[in-house]
Amino acid sequence: MKLFDYQEKALALTSDKDNSAFYYDMGLGKTFIGSERLRLYGKRVNIVVCQKSKIKDWCEHFKEHYTDYAVFDLTNKKDMQAFMVYPIYKCIGIINYELAYRREELRKLKDFTMMLDESSMIKNETAKRTKFMLSLKPSHTILLSGTPTDGKYEFLYSQLRLLGWKITKTAYYNRYIKTELRSYGGPTFRVVTGYKNVSELKAKLKEYGAVFAKAEEVIKLPEKKFIKEYSTVSSDYKKFMKDRIIKIDDKELTGDSTLSKRLYARMLCSAYSKDKISRLIDLVNSTSDRVIIFYNFNTELEALKKAVSDRPISIVNGQVKDLKAYENNDNSVTLIQYQAGAMGLNLQKAN
């Protein structure tokens, strides 16, 4: 597999590291860098933990580019059983974060490489999935993320432990995190107010195998490619197309004409599609850059606002033109109704 120069450089920088982390902007090929590092570690048994919407992509990636490995979808119980007893040959098991900690069999693995795609998913140390990942004993760990901390270094601690840095949380906070005690008439609690010794922290990250790259730092970028995300057809959509009527969230959709049937069918494929919304959330969470989302219907707008409620939101439609979040927050999400955004908008900040 032919890699770009900056990808080869990333592998060279981690060639002497037992663990590695590739904190690269979206579009710089973390998938290829991570899978090559996995191959170079040379373990017979390997697991990849990713977001649910990415399982199929990872399976296809390894099947296409690493034909000497047996690939198992560990969300499938039969594949899981086969993976745990697979003899002799090299194998890769792929599973999502939400299911991994329920697969107790994985604790039995020894002498294996573990790769975490979007490793920012384990930033919460008290979450079951984070505790489970920290309990495993891989020979090598690979972390991939475009947003390892989203600018908040207190969320980096669990990833540092996976990279092999044996620093206590107390020592980490005392050295790198500024905090203070506050009380608003109730119990006293500690809040993060800033950071210190950041240059030293970044140097430590590199020492333990972390490599960083922003898109603008890579001189020879590959030609841009459009990547399609496919969502599954829901049972609600199938039922509506058959019966022309369905009730969702106390709302009855009736396709009593060709036009209304087509209109509601489109809604069922967007605002009412749980799989599509889930994939969108995963996509937004994979970057800390500005994101632009175009939509058609008000029902879509409400679903989108709920889905990305943890990010600063701007909205442009026939009734509202609010671009404050877009202008002032580099991690904002801008929701634009197709017709309202057809002309007259400069959105170049969203690279």
Protein language model annotation of sequence segments:
Residues 1-23:
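Conserved pre-motif I regulatory segment
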Residues 17-37:
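Walker A/P-loop
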Residues 33, 43-64, 150-155, 296-299:
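Conserved Walker A/P-loop ATP-binding site and its immediately adjacent core
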Residues 44-45, 113, 121, 130-216:
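Conserved P-loop NTPase motor "coupling/switch" region that bridges the ATPase
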Residues 54-77, 163-167:
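Conserved helix-turn-beta segment of the N-terminal RecA-like "Helicase ATP-binding" lobe
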Residues 79-113:
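Conserved helix/coil segment N-terminal to the catalytic DExD/H
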Residues 81-82, 292-294, 301-341:
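Conserved helicase ATPase core of P-loop NTP-dependent helicases/translocases
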Residues 216-309:
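Conserved helicase/translocase motor-coupling segment
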